[in-house]
Amino acid sequence: MNNKTTMLIDADVLAYQSAFTAQANIQWDEELWTVHTDLALAKTWIVDRLETFKKRLKADDFILAISDKNNFRRKLFPDYKANRRSKFAPIGLDPIRAWMAEEYGTVIYPNLEADDVLAILATERPNRSDKRIIVSIDKDFKGVPCTFYDFNRGELHEITEEEADAYHLMQTIAGDSVDGFKGVSGIGQVKAKRLLDTNGASWETVLKAYSDAGMTEEEALTNAWMAYLIRKDEYNHKHKKLKYLWMPKEFTTAQKRKYSHIIHGVTGELDEDLTRPDPF
């Protein structure tokens, strides 16, 4: 029996955190300030983190995932993560990404975020003999049936498929201000979870929350697509594209066909205008 443990690491987070750690403001005189990054410091920080993760999780190997410059979610919702576009990215970010790719190798799937890549690799686990652990700080991974290590909090989570599906529905109702999509007005995560616990973790509960707020089924579906991380059966590795988008299990064939034009828009070739915006 193969007892190998592989860490699936969110390299986007490592790149950002190391770049901010290595960045410094320098005052040369009363009116002259500059910003610089010590790439050697950033590289050392990443190496130390990887060793810490390996010891903490008793891991044998790791895979680093990076987000593609294109993102299928922007075709569905152009304002997805738009709130991040005006933020100043650390100046060493691109060189650090390039160094990780050269030093360790990084995995990028066309049109997907690093989170999607990790979710796909994690949900392949039933067909593999190794144990896989997602390593990140992103609570969105509670919406994936997986083992998830939140390294900011030092917490290890074993998430069942039932728990993951319920978390996804909760995010659909509550929205995610960090990712820039709003859910039902006046309903946060606590209230959304209470609704699902009381009325059942179903699409019917989600739709009623939207309907009561004067919102449409399509708005609910769009938010569900924003919140959902792609799993193994939904991505075509050979052709490097999405096979299909998540749909409520309660949907009939006729209901699915109603949204087929939207689905076909993102399961084909994606437009170049979905490129990740320049951070400056």
Please identify what each model-predicted range represents.
Residues 2, 33, 59, 83-280:
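Extended two-metal-dependent nuclease catalytic cores across DNA- and RNA-processing enzymes
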Residues 1-98:
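Domain-level signal for Mg2+-assisted phosphodiester chemistry and nucleotide/NA-binding surfaces
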